């Protein structure tokens, strides 16, 4: 379910303090290897340096962003020697924008880094390795994001509205001419958006903007004070010109300006359409999402007469394709609104064999009424915190096969260790390249009862 983008960031290491290093200081370094978050690692004068933009083997000059204990966070500013792994970034704000952190690294090496991260985390936290490594699931390198959040900030002193993406390791807003990772319809809207917002009569009322694309395009504007009619009309005309729905959000939940407006996305292989609202979790990469569902169902390999449990089911992204194949699917989710929408999606797609329940998945499952008859096949798609309490009960649920989809290799590895303690074997694992140009790792693992 809901993911927070991230990776290994600056963390104090504890122990004796190293020499004080002022922010802004420049240091010549040789990069030794990559951290899991894609930053280069170097050692100098007893300090470990994490350098954004550095690649193994490179000699560079880095500027200090922050330092504590024996760890320094820095950014590459000048190259003396370049790695063969380096490529020219196609984006004009790469290195400044906080969205794409790996554009300077060849895509094949991005995949290798993510594979290495998964392998090392499984070894570190669980001491295990899968019997088989699956090939990475990949999609387009660019033009894949169907959702984006654009930062907006009114500078009262300068009488200026800043519109763009958050910078890496700061609160700066980086303006952009185009964003290459967005799907083309959202690129068009994003390119025209700054000029629209900067013409607002009351730009200080804008909080941020989110863009969505699926069965329709949509623009959500979060406002901190009521919009004046003139600005509201500008927004409506802009959205009409770009064939996009307009949604507004004040202190309450997002609401469409046109009450009949609906957002959704299609899963063509299963002839499904799933409705959602701004704020609901939806995978941002449509091609990889479909490949992920296909692989999950292939690995789980449910028979037509099986009961399948889908934990952290959300809108029914896995539940409804499963319901096309098996006798009964039970989806469980912690957020009541998502449970309601999953049920509505099942009904809208004519699936009477998918049933959804709300439950706190950090607590015991075996006592729940929906769990009484047990399940031989289970699918989990938890948030970054993982599913430790749920996996502790896999054997009591009767699960013979478990597919675990993860957005955090560290918690997947921790939970894999618990699965191993219950007698499950890690049959297969692999990465899902849901976020090309970033170090974010999604993964899938198949466990079978021993």
Swiss-Prot record:
The keyword Lipid biosynthesis does not apply. [4Fe-4S] cluster binds at residues 91, 97, 100, 179. GO terms for biological process: rRNA base methylation. S-adenosyl-L-methionine binds at residues 283, 312, 317, 333, 360, 381. It catalyses: uridine(1939) in 23S rRNA + S-adenosyl-L-methionine = 5-methyluridine(1939) in 23S rRNA + S-adenosyl-L-homocysteine + H(+). The keyword Methyltransferase applies. It holds the Pfam family TRAM. The active site is at residue 407. It is an enzyme of class 2 (transferase). Residues 20-78 form the TRAM domain. GO terms for molecular function: 4 iron, 4 sulfur cluster binding; iron ion binding; RNA binding; rRNA (uridine-C5-)-methyltransferase activity. Keywords: 4Fe-4S, Iron, Iron-sulfur, Metal-binding, Methyltransferase, rRNA processing, S-adenosyl-L-methionine, Transferase. InterPro entries: 23S_rRNA_MeTrfase_RlmD, MeTrfase_TrmA_AS, MeTrfase_TrmA_CS, NA-bd_OB-fold, SAM-dependent_MTases_sf, TRAM_dom, U5_MeTrfase_fam. Residues 1-22 are annotated as: Disordered. Its EC number is 2.1.1.190. Catalyzes the formation of 5-methyl-uridine at position 1939 (m5U1939) in 23S rRNA. Belongs to the class I-like SAM-binding methyltransferase superfamily. RNA M5U methyltransferase family. RlmD subfamily. This is 23S rRNA (uracil(1939)-C(5))-methyltransferase RlmD. It comes from Pseudomonas aeruginosa (strain ATCC 15692 / DSM 22644 / CIP 104116 / JCM 14847 / LMG 12228 / 1C / PRS 101 / PAO1). The gene is rlmD.
